[in-house]
Amino acid sequence: MTPREIASQAAHAIAVLNELTHGGGELSNSTDVRAIVRSLELIGQGLPQLCEQLARFLVIQHEDGQLTNADGLDPDDSVTEVIEALAAAGQAADMMTAALTEARAASQVLSPARTRGWESRQEAD
């Protein structure tokens, strides 16, 4: 598979997760939430490196004269803009990952409640 195909699959996986979890959909309990958050955390950990590698590729392509601007202008400004945006995306991914780590850690104390029988519910009322 190509990097492009894998990126498309990753985007599709997030879209499917959004569909499956809409309104609680396919979620069973807090353990499901914690597992999904952990997976998102792992994705987030890899995004800064990926953004850096994409930027590095564009720099090399530009230095080798392999990039042109569709408007016929010098591609310097466009390449710089893409590189800066990718750097910002990498930083945002770091922040997202930190928040996901915090969410996962905070969720450790949550567990599914025991189902109480009808008698226990009446006593609680």
Tell me what each language-model feature is.
Residues A106-D125:
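Short, charged, intrinsically disordered terminal tails
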Residues M1-S111:
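Hydrophobic alpha-helical segments that drive targeting, anchoring, or assembly
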